[in-house]
């Protein structure tokens, strides 16, 4: 009986408890200037926002992190708006291409939205061949619909025959529309499998897939790292392996095409460094022992 009464009291009090603002998580309407006490939080995860910087005579100093070097006032600093509702924090940029990010306030995820913003600006390249193919498919679809409609009105057909014509028409239109969709330019934010990642992504991939061949420039048996200039020159050997990388939403994967197939999946925004080459060697040693 006491348990039932306690549950009833909790059920009645739950709305009251939930309505009480928790320290640091009370509602924050959309604003360009978050409270001063929250600057450290926002400037950690939205470090390029203008409210994190004091600019004077073209030179900007970080308001929160004193050890941060001075920077010149340029497009690195963006106008931002932030908001918080319950445990969801969000911020977005008022730039030519708006970038919006939502995260948990208590367990936030670091997101370098400025780099992502710059990538979107750079990726706006029109694929002429895909556009031509798409336009031809659309013209063919419209012409086919017009022709069938004109011929259909002249024919005296039974209901079953008409149904078959309609079904065939829908199947054909479905195939054409699928072809159109599949040939639209794909967003490079989520590229599928590729042998060579974009130049701008090399630093990411070569940090976590450091043995992949696309990270190295080899000449006369000597290889130099493309990304990290302080990396020593190495001899071209089986340390460098052929790799394929892919990304789908926030899942990044790379696989080594060696004597055995080896792949590693990770979260793109919070990647985990894995010495997959050592693991690969371990697999090879175990196989040789058998």
Curated annotation (Swiss-Prot):
Keywords: Glycoprotein, Host membrane, Membrane, Transmembrane, Transmembrane helix. The chain crosses the membrane at residues 1-19, 128-148, 163-183. The keyword Methyltransferase does not apply. Pfam families: v110 (PF01639). The keyword Ribosomal protein does not apply. It is a multi-pass membrane protein. It is found in: Host membrane. One of its GO terms (cellular component) is host cell membrane. Glycans are attached at residues 242, 267. InterPro entries: ASFV_fam_110. Signal peptide: none annotated. Plays a role in virus cell tropism, and may be required for efficient virus replication in macrophages. Belongs to the asfivirus MGF 110 family. This is Protein MGF 110-9L. It comes from African swine fever virus (isolate Warthog/Namibia/Wart80/1980).
């Amino acid at each position: 009986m006491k348990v039932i009464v306690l549950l009833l009291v909790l059920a009645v009090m739950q709305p009251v408890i939930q309505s009480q603002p928790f320290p640091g998580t009370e509602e924050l309407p959309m604003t360009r200037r978050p409270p001063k006490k929250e600057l450290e939080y926002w400037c950690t995860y939205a470090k390029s926002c203008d409210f994190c910087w004091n600019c004077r005579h073209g030179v900007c100093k970080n308001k929160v992190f004193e050890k941060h070097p001075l920077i010149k006032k340029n497009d690195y600093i963006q106008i931002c708006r932030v908001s918080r509702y319950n445990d969801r924090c969000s911020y977005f940029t008022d730039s030519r291409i708006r970038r919006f990010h939502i995260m948990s306030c208590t367990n936030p995820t670091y997101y370098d939205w400025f780099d992502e913003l710059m990538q979107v600006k750079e990726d706006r390249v029109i694929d002429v061949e895909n556009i031509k193919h798409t336009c031809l498919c659309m013209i063919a679809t419209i012409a086919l619909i017009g022709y069938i409609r004109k011929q259909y009105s002249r024919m005296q057909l039974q209901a079953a025959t008409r149904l078959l014509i309609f079904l065939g028409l829908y199947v054909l239109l479905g195939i054409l529309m699928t072809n159109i969709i599949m040939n639209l330019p794909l967003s490079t934010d989520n590229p599928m499998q590729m042998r060579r990642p974009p130049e701008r992504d090399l630093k990411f991939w070569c940090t976590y897939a450091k043995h992949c061949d696309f990270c190295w420039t080899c000449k006369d048996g000597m290889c130099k790292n493309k990304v990290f200039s302080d990396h020593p020159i190495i001899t071209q050997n089986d340390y460098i392996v052929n790799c394929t990388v892919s990304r789908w939403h926030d899942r990044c994967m790379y696989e080594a095409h060696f004597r055995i197939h080896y792949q590693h999946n990770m979260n793109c925004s919070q990647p985990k460094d894995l010495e997959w080459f050592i693991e690969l060697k371990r697999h090879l040693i175990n196989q040789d022992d058998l």
